[in-house]
Amino acid sequence: MSAIVGLCLLSEKVVLSRSLTDEVSKLYKLNRGNVKEPRKYATERMSTQSKPVALQVPVSTIILDYKNEDFIKQNPTYSAMDIIGSPSNTAPQTAFQSIMPSLSALFNTPFIQGAFRHRIISSMGPEISYLVMVIGPPSGFMDTPNVSSAQSSVHTVSNADVDLNDIIAINSTMAKSTKLVSASTLQAMLVNDVYDRCMDLDGILLSQALPFFRNYVNVQSKGSLPPAVAACLNTPIKELFSMGSGKREPLALEFRKDNEGQCIGIVLPKGHEGDTLSSRYPAVFINESEPFSDKERSELSELKRTDSDAYEKLYSETISKHVSDGSYGNRVIISHKMSRLSNGGVKIIGRFKISDFNTVKKNLSSRSGEIDSAKEQWEALSGNGLVTDSNISMLHDKILDTITSNKPGVVLRDGNKKSENIVVCFKNGFPNKKHSLLQLTKNGISVVSLDELTDAGILVESTGPDRVRRSPKVLANKLSSFKGRKVTLDVDNMSTEALIQKLSTL
């Protein structure tokens, strides 16, 4: 099931969720399942004594409005902005238009209108978030929250006139600040409860919207809506969603023409599997020497043996020549050295390396003659702005993160991915704390919710007492009628690579 959710992000950790319509209530029920409400008080062991502490549930969104797949299919020409609403349009009137002024007054701070994508690919590695669209955080709302433990109070600092930990006071203030009758209904939610259950957001919208929501807060706080964001928000929904068979299309990484026309590149030393990036994403990456002719390669090879300085100079000049004649197209150039790109007129958007050179040595075990030059390139990369990771796959994800931040119009596709995805449903919820949904998607594995699962898919039940969860009645009926493949895996004790390999061989 596809979904568009209007939301207002107030902070990274602490916020309130509110219900405006029956549809939103259904969304809460779908996401939360039959889980118990958290206790108002708990105890924490302090040496030999048990100390009572208040239990405050950290949450991250205010849900303003929700439209399901039926609505989208009935209104395929609506844009995201049409559905969510804004002060600049009138069709249809939604919660966004009526509630934003009240929220602004309640928290005594201006709200920024626009689009926002929360944690699709994080700077610390891949992580798929659970909500889709829109509104924006208020400036100066939240200072650093301190969450000492799951059993302790969540301490927050805010410029609001009401204590954010006092749900009753907020209900009362909200009711006085808005004309909406249901505006007094607020509820705290666990982020992971929503995340585990909400696997039904459409992958196409997630992937196509990604580049438009990078650096949103910084850009929007300056008072201008980027054209790319406006274009995405006003694109008809039918162009963002796959409306036919309901199958999720493979994610793609492709470029539109760069308005500036300048070639961009990244620095990645030998032994960092740059060839893997260029072969996996041929529409995005190109190795620095790929356009070189046989004659140019021969001249460079001769100079490399006799005059290293002349070799590097000619190398940069050759890159510059192919930049000028358009041989690199609009792709990102992967180079082993910064000087080659900068001297060749290429804009460097990132420098990357594995944090431990021993990993590089292992990658070059079959090419031992290149280890010395690889070490020289590795040691030359340092200073502010250098991106590192101990794992090559995670480093490549950070490269993709940088690319999507710097190139408007980028959508994610793995060029080596199978044309038909493996469809998998995790009965007990996707183990997001252990595994990367992005990694599964990149390897041709589509994770769907139980109500999306067909008999052609695979149902995975996770072992371990902490993975057991009661299912709502409608989903229990779906489980009993499922006739496809079923498998039980200890997913919490498997690496992501092992999980991908196992699912791929089923």
Curated annotation (Swiss-Prot):
Pfam families: Phytoreo_S7. It is found in: Virion; Host cytoplasm. InterPro entries: Phytoreo_S7. The keyword Magnesium does not apply. One of its GO terms (cellular component) is host cell cytoplasm. Residues 128-249, 325-355 are annotated as: RNA-binding. Its main location: virion. GO terms for molecular function: molecular adaptor activity; RNA binding. Keywords: Capsid protein, Host cytoplasm, RNA-binding, Virion. Belongs to the phytoreovirus protein P7 family. Probable component of the transcriptional machinery present in the inner capsid. Displays dsRNA binding activity and may play an important role in the sorting of viral RNA and virion assembly. Together with the RNA-directed RNA polymerase P1 and capping enzyme P5, forms an transcriptional complex positioned near the channels situated at each of the five-fold vertices of the core. This is Protein P7.
